[in-house]
Amino acid sequence: MRDYADNDSILLKHGWCEMLKGGVIMDVKNVEQAKIAEKAGAIGVMILENIPSELRNTDGVARSVDPLKIEEIRKCISINVLAKVRIGHFVEAQILEELKVDMLDESEVLTMADEYNHINKHKFKTPFVCGCTNLGEALRRISEGASMIRTKGEAGTGNIIEAIKHIRTVNNEIKYLCSLDESEVYNFAKKLRAPIDLILLTRKLKRLPVVNFAAGGIATPADAAMCMQLGMDGVFVGSGIFESENPQKMASSIVMAVSNFNNPKILLNVSLGLGKAMHGNTKVSNKWKNKSEEDNS
């Protein structure tokens, strides 16, 4: 059994993620977008070949970004640089760790590389973020070495409904865990298929034992603030910015909304005059459903 409260490597990676709390990480695909994100006050950029809204409309294989693009963008900004790898593709992760990116996202948005196994993230010095739809999935990813969790949501749709569903599901399952008699906890752990040590730690903390960001469909300052009011530590956003009428203003407003999520007056001010938000998609069909928790992990 791994001791999650007393391990130097784990504590170092988790500690780095703690510094991201209250921040916004933005999906970008070029230098121009990265500069918009930095100017807006983002704490980091997630570099992709295409933002999620574009990935949803393609049928080809979505792979990790060309390392050269990461180098080009990193030279032009001073904030954290993140990159996605395919689920289970530990060699993509090795390559990007060698490139010294700040964080890796083992992402369902890319085409899955291994249908049965996620990456053993304990083998890496670079912290990982992974998506989840429920508490059991979150704790399994943490047991594999994830230092940060995010909701899966519906990336690239501008539709926040799935992200909110995942946030509330995790929150409600934690509340239920905390309400159980001690003798009932072990059976609940079996139902979640989650390690008992992480179940007990979550019960003690009354929250996930790692930083937890919202992601998937966040398109407005109000969306971002709603996620924060539901207990998230920060947000990922991409298509919602760069498919809006005024990306720079939208990006800055979302950052302000996350920093002031409990202040309606500021939320009103940052929501004024943003122009048209991304068109979005109300048909939440989940292009990446085959990579969902129910099917794979």
From Swiss-Prot:
Keywords: Lyase, Pyridoxal phosphate, Schiff base. The keyword Lyase applies. It catalyses: aldehydo-D-ribose 5-phosphate + D-glyceraldehyde 3-phosphate + L-glutamine = pyridoxal 5'-phosphate + L-glutamate + phosphate + 3 H2O + H(+). The gene is pdx1. The active site is at K84 (schiff-base intermediate with d-ribose 5-phosphate). One of its GO terms (biological process) is pyridoxine biosynthetic process. PANTHER family: PYRIDOXAL 5'-PHOSPHATE SYNTHASE SUBUNIT SNZ1-RELATED. InterPro entries: Aldolase_TIM, PdxS/SNZ, PdxS/SNZ_N, RibuloseP-bd_barrel. Pathway: Cofactor biosynthesis; pyridoxal 5'-phosphate biosynthesis. It is an enzyme of class 4 (lyase). Gene3D superfamilies: Aldolase class I. One of its GO terms (molecular function) is pyridoxal 5'-phosphate synthase (glutamine hydrolysing) activity. This is Pyridoxal 5'-phosphate synthase subunit Pdx1.
